[in-house]
UniProtKB/Swiss-Prot annotation:
The keyword Protein transport does not apply. The lineage of its organism: Bacteria, Pseudomonadati, Pseudomonadota, Gammaproteobacteria, Vibrionales. In V.cholerae cheB2 is a pseudogene. This is Protein-glutamate methylesterase/protein-glutamine glutaminase 1. Residues 4-121 form the Response regulatory domain. PANTHER family: PROTEIN-GLUTAMATE METHYLESTERASE/PROTEIN-GLUTAMINE GLUTAMINASE, PROTEIN-GLUTAMATE METHYLESTERASE_PROTEIN-GLUTAMINE GLUTAMINASE 1. It comes from Vibrio cholerae serotype O1 (strain ATCC 39315 / El Tor Inaba N16961).
Length: 377
């Protein structure tokens, strides 16, 4: 039986185009369309689609409000379409907060090399989230603007500053059932995390649980368009105790700071342990992903060797496998997110099947495991 899809967009051209692409895949069938969020909510309840594709900017009711309504009453996997603008990025992140599982730029040809690849990309994204009802969440409360209040920003800044002071009070790092995990005893100088589909929510779950005194730098590689990463880094920074920033060329790595690879570029490490810096380069057109997990992991292996704690989280494809292989050859630690907690079990499966990862962990316990491993729990 074909996967039933509801297409939601106020543009008749885009509804027709998306419907044609979806219907050209035999496993998918567009059962209806909706022209605004209110109509989408009604048809989601009545038609019970397996997947919804949803525009963000629509009359009557916008896509974010529609996602919240649908998740509260008739949860279904939702793929968002958004514009490649800063405001579009922020709105997309709001939609993911509300419960949408994945997103694509509305001009999805912009992240594909040709039309055939663009068609396949959309079809694969719909197929990948179709069976993921277990990941559907109750909607988050509407996010006020600005994301973080001045008082909250001040509080976070003071806490971060205290952590770098010899007199700073160490915050509580207690985690539930930490005794189930045992630290390996290895010493680390870098944490590296790579992810794709489902990554924004996964990274938020992990990073918000890390204390301000996390002992070494963190590099994050999330497949994301160029205009999205700054907004994503800003959002994470407003929610986390650690500092999170979009990486810039020449950044010196500092403990307790997470550096998010900028979209459309490659992030590499240069220098030596204790004095390492980031290099942000174009990387050429031969790479399938920009940023690419393999590129960052490979450079981390050369600089930090066995002093890297690395993780591959939910994502489509196999990016990260070869970089993780280089890390393993250097003696580093590689973990993978387990299948049950992945939105798409592609990237973690690739490292697990290759025998590269040493532990497969549920998303809810990765931060706990990290804290045990680095000696903070």
């Amino acid at each position: 039986m074909a996967i039933k899809v509801l297409v939601v967009d106020d543009s008749s051209f885009f509804r027709r185009r998306v419907s044609e692409i979806i219907n050209s895949e035999s496993r998918l069938e567009v059962i209806d369309v909706a022209v605004n969020g209110k109509e989408a909510v009604e048809k989601a309840a009545r038609l019970k689609p397996d997947v919804i594709t949803m525009d963000i900017e629509m009359p009557v009711m916008d896509g974010i409000s529609a996602v919240r309504e649908i998740m509260a009453n008739n949860p279904v996997p939702i793929l968002m379409f958004s514009s490649l603008t800063h405001d579009g990025a922020k709105a997309t992140l709001d939609a993911l907060d509300a419960g949408a599982l994945d997103f694509l730029p509305k001009k999805f040809e912009d992240i594909a090399r040709n039309r055939d690849e663009a068609v396949t990309l959309l079809q694969q994204r719909v197929l990948s989230i179709a069976s993921k009802k277990m990941f559907l969440r109750r909607p988050a409360a509407p996010r006020p603007a600005p994301t973080t209040s001045i008082a909250a920003s001040s509080s976070l800044s003071q806490e971060r500053a205290a952590a770098t002071s010899p007199l700073g009070n160490r915050p509580s790092t207690a985690v539930s059932a930490a005794t189930r995990f045992k630290a390996s005893g290895k010493k680390y100088q870098l944490t590296a995390i790579g992810t794709s589909t489902g990554g924004p929510v996964a990274l938020q779950k992990i990073l918000t649980k890390l204390p301000v005194n996390y002992p070494h730098p963190i590099v994050l590689i999330q497949h994301m368009p160029a205009t999205f990463t700054a907004a994503f880094a800003s959002r994470l920074n407003s929610l986390c105790k650690i500092e999170v920033k979009e990486a810039e060329d020449g950044d010196m790595l500092r403990p307790g700071v997470a550096y998010l690879a900028p979209g459309g570029k490659q992030m590499m490490l240069d220098g030596r342990p204790g004095a390492a810096r980031l290099r942000i380069i174009d990387g050429g057109d031969r790479m399938n992903y920009k940023p690419c997990v393999d590129v960052t992991f490979g450079s981390a292996a050369k600089i930090f060797g066995d002093k890297v704690l690395s993780m591959i989280l939910t994502g489509m494809g196999a990016d990260g496998r070869e970089g993780a292989r280089m890390l393993k050859q250097a003696g580093a630690t590689i973990w993978a997110q387990d299948e049950e907690s992945c939105v798409v079990y592609g990237m973690p499966q690739a490292v697990a099947k290759a025998g590269i990862s040493t532990e497969d962990l549920p998303l809810e316990r990765i931060a706990e495991r990290m804290l045990v491993e680095v000696g903070l729990a």
